[in-house]
Amino acid sequence: MLFAVGDPQADDNFVFEPYNVNNSISVAANLREAFKKSELLQSGYKHALVAIDAPTMLVPLDEYREQDAETLYKHTLKWQRSEDILTSTMPKLNAVAVFAVSKDLKMVVDNHFENIQVQPQMQAVWTHLYKYAFAGIRQKLFAYFHDKRMEVIRFQRNRFEFCNSYVANSTQDILYYLLYVWKLMGMDRGDNELYLAGNVPNRDELCTELQQFVNRYHVLEVATDFNNAAMATQKEIPYDLKALYLG
């Protein structure tokens, strides 16, 4: 869990505060404790953007119907009665993200801020990677690594064509899933590109293996990925937060 405030793009005025969670209690209970201890949370801010790491269903914007979102989510992903189903519209990506958040967690946030916006943690990453999707003539597949997971994304015709999450425990698992999607999307035919972003595990080993199957792959270096902003060089700040502030 972490908290941040500021505008690093304007003046490098940015405060970043990680919070060590107690895994024996819920996220909501941890947040209640954080409000008692965190100087940042006690600073009197009225508005908050909450990024939730949660399974997310993506619906094309032109097919989205608000009245159907909850039913579709419950038939697609696991849902508990203790959760509220929320949505976040992404006009640039022509999609609506549908996801669930603990009612207790949302209540804690609502009790401390006058205005809140909730979105999936991946939303900032999707928006940032989308900027690369249509640069040049080659088709592109993206793999983003975080928290022992790999998110594989492909954009086509200004929208998502593929988006899925995989457990990334080993180089062989990563390679298997990547090459499966690479072939599924028909990218093994032609001079296409693979982009790797985030905390790439076993980077050298993975790149060595990829050379056998993918002619063009790129590992996005964080500093240059975010135009060498001062915030981008801080390793303790996760990629998704950099994408949110700098993307």
Go through each PLM region and give its residues.
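Hydrophobic/aromatic-enriched cytosolic interaction surfaces used to assemble or bind macromolecules
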Residues: 1-247
